[in-house]
């Protein structure tokens, strides 16, 4: 068993009105694979999900010509656990990576890059890594972080922009960026991707194109800064007054944020405006990348996957960033598949899926065995419009917290000594001992969502009537049957994802469904 570092990227493919409805033709034996991943991108802030602002027209057009999911969930709403799960197809409870600070501890047998190399692909990472993956495992490596490109290979203008990013203390620039679009990270990354794709067309490529935005620091240039003015954006569904209903740990998050930025409540709409502008900037750069695939005549043989590692509050509950809980604004992610063999469907798939399902799906696409220890299910039959067991995808699980007991107001709350607050610099880390304490699980099934923790405390929400998750129905006797059903599904998920690693030496053969289905055809015969 090996331990590696790697980060996942979302593949986005779009061309607006020029994109033709995709026929469900079989892909070539080795289609190119482009995974475009964003960082901290909300799933619901787009028109295909009913949001009134036109933040992602290109992605929306791709989604409606491919297959997209509105019940896709991350494995855990933090970068390193989510990205590690993306690469390995394993939940954080199996990878042992439950925080952003132990990426080197990842446990798995083979990951996405191992399989792509085995299948004959040339591989690349362009963008944010934030996993165990290292450059010597990838054919082409160009790493970016939230303060710019890592390394010295950049122009004077790019270096100046990266210095500017570092000056923002992972917060918000309420003014337009003083730099043009050519210095923005997604633009520079597209330039590098175009060069790498063009240099060799003899082998199929696997590219993890991992955009560091719209993660903080929120910032963008014109015209994106002015595209969604604060006085023309829709109101948030919740605010800081909702914190009393969400619980003490949410209040901790709000307290530490206000210590760093006491003026934030009065500027929340401008922060949201900047975030929406970043979404549109990302969308435009995805189009540049897609246009290049067409120019190189490889668009029709490229499978594109678009996703994010997790979401962001973006003003809900009076917060930004991520940190507390498993609300959908953090845990639900965008997921789009487009390319040869994938059946077009304008409506969202009813299937409940996870970030861990991407790796086994790619294994099946390239004709390689799904490695032992992978806990995700292949979506390939579903994506092709073929028959698949509906019960396999009628619910999905997610995780949160790094363990231990909850910190409360009775405990020491010296945020600066903890290292999660620097008042002088105006910075705060939303992933800290308070917000990450405890262990949580979520279970989504249809319009219902369950959150359950290690103390037995539960939350039950009707997501159709209460998408902001403020009306907890867990202790309402009228919903006992629904609660029991979701608890049974959660228990089933916990048992079915028991980790088979390490492999028992010279003993026992581990039986698996060929698509790695967990629940279909697994019952004992009577």
PLM feature segments, named:
Residues 85-183, 189, 400:
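Catalytic-site neighborhoods of secreted/periplasmic enzymes
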Residues 25-31, 38, 42-43, 68, ...:
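Long, internal low-complexity/basic segments
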Residues 56-57, 86, 128, 135-137, ...:
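Polar, surface-exposed loop/tail segments
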Residues 27-31, 43-48, 53, 153-187, ...:
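Active-site-proximal cap/lid insertion segments
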């Amino acid at each position: 068993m090996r331990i590696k570092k790697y980060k996942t990227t979302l593949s986005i493919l779009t061309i607006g009105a020029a994109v033709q409805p995709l026929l469900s033709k079989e892909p070539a034996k080795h289609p190119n694979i482009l995974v475009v991943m964003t960082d901290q991108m909300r799933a619901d802030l787009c028109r295909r999900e009913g949001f009134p602002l036109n933040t992602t027209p290109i992605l929306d057009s791709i989604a409606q010509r491919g297959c997209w999911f509105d019940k896709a969930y991350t494995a855990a709403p933090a970068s390193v656990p989510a990205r590690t799960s993306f690469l390995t197809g394993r939940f954080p409870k199996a990878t042992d990576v439950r925080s952003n600070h132990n990426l080197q501890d990842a446990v798995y047998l083979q990951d996405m890059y191992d399989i792509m190399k085995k299948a004959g692909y040339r591989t690349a990472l362009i963008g944010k890594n934030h996993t165990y993956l290292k450059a010597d495992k990838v054919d082409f490596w160009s790493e970016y972080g939230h303060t710019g490109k890592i390394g010295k290979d950049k122009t004077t203008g790019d270096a100046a922009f990266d210095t500017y990013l570092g000056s923002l203390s992972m917060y918000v620039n309420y003014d337009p960026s003083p730099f043009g679009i050519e210095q923005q990270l997604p633009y520079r990354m597209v330039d590098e991707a175009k060069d790498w794709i063009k240099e060799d067309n003899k082998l199929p490529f696997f590219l993890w194109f991992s955009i560091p935005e719209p993660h903080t620091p929120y910032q963008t240039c014109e015209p994106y800064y002015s595209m969604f003015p604060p006085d023309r954006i829709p109101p948030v569904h919740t605010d800081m007054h909702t914190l009393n209903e969400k619980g003490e740990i949410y209040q901790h998050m709000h307290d530490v944020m206000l210590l760093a930025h006491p003026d934030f409540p009065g500027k929340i709409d401008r922060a949201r405006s900047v975030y929406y502008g970043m979404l549109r900037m990302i969308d435009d750069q995805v189009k540049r990348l897609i246009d290049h695939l067409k120019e190189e005549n490889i668009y029709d043989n490229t499978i594109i996957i678009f996703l994010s590692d997790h979401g962001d509050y973006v003003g809900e509950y009076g917060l930004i960033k991520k940190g507390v809980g498993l609300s959908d604004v953090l845990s639900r992610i965008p997921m789009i598949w487009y390319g040869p063999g994938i059946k077009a469907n304008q409506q969202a798939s009813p299937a409940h899926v996870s970030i861990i399902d991407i790796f086994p799906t790619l294994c099946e696409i390239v004709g390689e065995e799904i490695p032992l220890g992978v806990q995700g299910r292949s979506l390939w039959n579903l994506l092709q419009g073929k028959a698949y067991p509906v019960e396999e995808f009628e619910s999905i699980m997610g995780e949160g917290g790094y363990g231990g007991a909850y910190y409360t107001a009775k405990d020491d709350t010296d945020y600066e000594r903890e290292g999660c607050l620097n008042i002088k610099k105006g910075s705060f880390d939303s992933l800290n001992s308070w917000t990450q304490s405890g262990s949580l699980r979520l279970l989504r099934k249809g319009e219902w969502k369950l959150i359950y923790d290690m103390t037995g405390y539960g939350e039950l929400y009707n997501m159709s009537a209460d998408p902001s998750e403020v009306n907890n129905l867990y202790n309402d006797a009228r919903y006992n049957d629904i609660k029991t059903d979701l608890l049974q599904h959660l228990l089933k998920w916990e048992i079915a994802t028991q980790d088979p690693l390490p492999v028992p030496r010279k003993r026992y053969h581990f039986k698996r469904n060929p698509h790695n289905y967990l629940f279909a055809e697994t019952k004992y015969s009577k």
